[in-house]
Amino acid sequence: MKMTLLGAGVRAPFVLRGLAAGAADLDLDEVVLFDTDPERLELMTALGGHFAASWGAPFTVRNEPDAESALAGARFVFSAIRPGQEAARAVDEEVPLKHGVLGQETTGPGGFAMALRTIPAMVAYGQLIERVAPNALLVNFTNPVGIVMQALHDHTSVRAIGICDGPISMQRSVAEFLGLPREQVHADYAGLNHCGWIHRVLVDGEDRLPEVIDRFEELQATDDQWALFDPELVRSIGMLPMEYLYFYYYRDTAVEHIRGSGS
């Protein structure tokens, strides 16, 4: 079975690590990397191949500089692309800040600018997948995930799901705080990508969220992702907020801090 990684960026080694760890449950023969930056593609292929071998992965890692060849016959496609790369990201973040507006890749005008660059590229890849890998499942990690997924569903017939590691990170944090295995803790997350809340934490059928919220200061001391929020705010909403909601709950403060950091 073939899997293609669209975008050979910093996420590639993490994806390969997960694939290697789950290899016993996968019938994966090869992972093919594709990127529009030839130098980065060669570098990440060499790095990924070295890591995969050191992890004992049963699949090969190679690259294809041509998107059609990279995607042809793939059973799964993992997408993590950034059209314009870091130079465009810097513009997305800096221009809004000059006008007192948050600049961020999924929020406000910066997020919209990224969407304008990303949607045409992702729709084009989706249409290519339709043609050369019609049975593939596209797993999209490309931001802004929500609007990119809407575009894929509206303008292609490719099977696609959007993912984010945020909710999993939140669930893992709560499980560790409660001193329980992650598999024993079911966290109900409601909302959109980078805009959601955990509204229930089930352990053996019992909702432990009220306890977690009552002890929120203790939770904050165990994981920095909660440090942004005032405990009284969390108690007033009765849910655990995704860290990106900081940019909504504390917009003016966020803009001030980003400006002050010089980044």
PLM regions and their residue ranges:
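NAD(P)+-binding Rossmann beta1-loop-alpha1 motif at the extreme N-terminus of oxidoreductases
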Residues: 1-49
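Residues at the starts of beta-strands that form the adenosine-phosphate
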Residues: 2, 29-30, 60, 137, ...
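Short helix-capping segments at alpha-helix termini
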Residues: 23-26, 51-57, 156, 178-180
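Conserved N-terminal Rossmann-fold NAD(P) cofactor-binding segment
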Residues: 38-73, 80-89
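Short acidic/histidine-rich motifs immediately flanking catalytic phosphotransfer sites
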Residues: 73-75, 135
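Rossmann-fold NAD(P)-binding glycine/threonine-rich loop
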Residues: 83, 87-155
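Long, compositionally biased stretches enriched for glycine and/or charged residues
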Residues: 179-263
